[in-house]
Structures are given as structure tokens and as C-alpha cells.
């Protein structure tokens, strides 16, 4: 079964053809990242305009790369939530039009579910398992009970891990995206040079990163006021350690308490080298099995949408003609 996956939740316009939820036949991405760099972050208006300009060509290229046309597609899967509402609407409306024009079933896909599904593409992972989903907008610990059933065990109370890393990178004067820049420079610094706070929370699996973000801002401002040279690499390494240690500690507690031995990472921050290394160390120590998405599938892409779309489709999920886009949507809410 071939699924055409369409993704437009942020600044990547992406489409892919995926067979049986596991085999990627094509994967095409057009990004407006370079434009957003000029502003130090994603500008929703620019993202939406670039989606509108690119989506038709991206879908055509994905079909061509897979050596098929719409007659060879069994269903169209499209990201409908969460994300930038204007960006999402471009993908949803394009997919709805294509579905009606070709009489092809349409399947709505939750963005975070598709990030989880990136692991299905690159390995033999099957539910049940515990997944740490970390991105610029979300930080969740999710029990994946089957391919379409999820239970959120913990989530961030404030900033997401990716957001905190990006803002710290910007504070340190590093190029956008800040999280990627921190990951690149951190190996040249001393990760024990600065101690960043680990917040106490009354819920055992939740996260809070606003305190870490405030701490690095205060350190930078204090040193600048004194005219001191910023030890950028040390600050980057220490901040990255603070964020990733918090993520791994909460993941370990949730896995231990709930008895999970199959662990996965997902989302853009799952590409972070220290997070991957420390999670691997934890799983080796505990004798758990770790599943990591390939780096090319960590960021937003159409292949992960096609993968999750397959499992939603075979479970009977179909979009109604009035399918809309939503800026927010819990991952554990049933899909229609």
C-alpha cells in the first residue's frame, strides 16, 4: 500500500511516498530556512507564502521520484495539527483538493505522531514502547500502546527543550537555529564549567526549561556588564548538558516506573548528539533496547507523515470533507 505524505506544519514543505508504513520510495523537502535566518526565527507569514509557492512542485517531484502517479497512491496523509495555522492550512487545503480531484482517501495525521513514526522507517520498532518526543515546540514522554493509541506520561510545563536550546543559542550570539549551533560548538567546551538548575516539579515526569533559559540569559548579561569575555563554548556545552540530563533523567524514571524496556527518541531535538549519546548510555546500562530515527528523518519531512498515515489508514481513520487545521492538539486525542 502506497501513501503520499504531505507536511507543512512549520517552515519545511515536504512530500513523500511511503509503502506499507516502512519503505520510503521518495522524500522531497523544500525549506525556507535561509529566509528565516535573517530574522533569527521562523516568520509565519514567510513560511505560509513559501508553502503556497512550493507545495505543488514538491508533491509532483515526490511522485516522480517514486516512479508513480496518483493512480498508484492508495491514500493521501496530511499533517493537520499542531503547528503554525497558516502553514498547516496550505498543506491541508492542497491535500483536500488533491483528494477530491483524484478520488483518493484522505487521512489526517498528528504532527507528533508522525515524528514517532520516523522510527518505523529506520528500524523494526513495534509498539508498545516509550518515546521521548522533543522538538522546538514540544517535549513529551509518551507511552505508545499501539500504532494509533498514545498516553502522555509527562510534558513540559513551559518552554520546550528545542525552544530553550534555540533561545540559549541566540543569547550566546550563535547562528540560527541556535540548538544546532550549540550542538556543533559544545564539544569544544567544558560541559561542567557552569551548573544549570534542575527544577523540582510535583509531577515526576514533567519538564521545565524556563529556569535554565533564564539562568543562561542572566549569566551572559552579568558577564557583559562586567566587560568579561563570554566563554561561549563552555556555556553552550554546560547548557546542553543541563537540558539533555533533565530529559534523560525523566525518561529513565518513566521507563523504570512503567516497566518499559523498548525506548525511542523522536522530534527535531532527537538529532542532538549528546541526547543520543546519553540515552544510548542509559539503555546500555539498563539493558533496554533503544531506537533512534535516522538523522535525515529527525526534522520535519513527508516520509514520517506517510509512515504514520499508513497506520492511521489501516485502522480506519479518514478525513471528513470539512477537515480543518489546528494550531494545538494533544497527541493522545483520538483522530476523528
What do these predicted regions represent?
Residues 108-109, 263, 280-304:
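Conserved phosphate-binding/catalytic loops in two-lobed NTP-binding clefts
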Residues 2-82, 111, 115:
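N-terminal beta-alpha supersecondary unit
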Residues 78-102, 273-282:
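Short Gly/Thr/Asp-enriched flexible loops that form oxyanion-binding sites at enzyme active sites
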Amino acid at each position: 500500500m502506497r501513501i503520499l505524505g504531505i507536511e507543512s506544519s512549520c517552515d519545511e514543505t515536504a512530500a513523500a511516498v511511503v509503502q506499507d508504513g516502512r519503505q520510503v520510495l521518495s522524500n522531497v523537502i523544500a525549506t525556507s530556512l535561509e529566509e528565516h535566518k535573517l530574522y533569527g526565527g521562523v516568520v509565519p507569514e514567510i513560511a505560509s507564502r513559501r508553502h503556497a509557492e512550493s507545495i505543488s512542485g514538491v508533491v509532483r517531484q515526490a511522485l516522480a521520484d517514486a516512479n508513480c502517479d496518483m493512480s498508484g497512491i492508495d491514500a493521501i496523509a496530511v499533517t493537520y495539527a499542531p503547528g503554525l495555522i497558516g502553514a498547516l492550512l496550505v498543506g491541508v487545503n492542497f491535500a483536500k483538493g488533491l483528494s477530491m480531484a483524484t478520488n483518493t482517501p484522505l487521512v489526517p495525521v498528528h504532527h507528533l505522531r508522525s515524528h514517532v513514526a520516523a522510527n518505523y522507517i529506520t528500524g523494526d520498532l513495534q509498539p508498545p514502547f516509550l518515546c521521548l518526543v522533543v522538538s522546538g515546540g514540544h517535549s513529551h514522554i509518551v507511552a505508545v500502546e499501539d500504532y494509533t493509541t498514545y498516553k502522555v506520561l509527562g510534558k513540559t510545563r513551559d518552554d520546550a527543550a528545542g525552544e530553550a536550546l534555540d533561545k540559549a543559542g541566540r543569547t550566546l550570539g550563535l547562528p540560527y537555529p541556535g540548538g544546532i549551533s550549540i550542538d556543533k560548538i559544545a564539544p569544544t567546551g567544558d560541559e561542567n564549567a557552569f551548573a544549570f538548575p534542575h527544577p523540582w516539579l510535583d509531577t515526576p515526569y514533567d519538564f521545565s526549561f524556563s529556569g535554565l533559559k533564564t539562568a543562561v540569559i542572566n549569566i551572559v548579561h552579568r558577564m557583559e556588564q562586567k566587560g568579561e569575555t563570554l566563554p561561549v563554548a563552555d556555556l553552550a556545552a554546560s547548557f546542553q548538558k543541563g537540558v539533555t540530563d533533565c530529559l534523560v533523567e525523566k525518561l529513565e524514571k518513566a521507563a523504570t516506573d512503567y516497566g518499559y524496556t523498548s525506548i525511542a527518541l523522536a522530534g527535531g531535538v532527537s538529532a542532538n548528539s549528546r541526547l543520543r549519546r546519553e540515552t544510548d548510555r542509559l539503555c546500555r546500562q539498563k539493558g533496554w533496547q533503544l531506537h533512534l530515527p535516522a538523522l535525515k528523518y529527525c526534522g520535519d519531512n513527508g516520509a514520517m507523515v506517510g509512515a504514520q498515515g499508513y497506520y492511521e489508514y489501516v485502522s480506519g481513520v479518514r478525513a471528513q470533507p470539512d477537515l480543518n487545521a489546528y494550531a494545538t492538539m494533544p497527541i493522545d486525542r483520538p483522530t476523528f
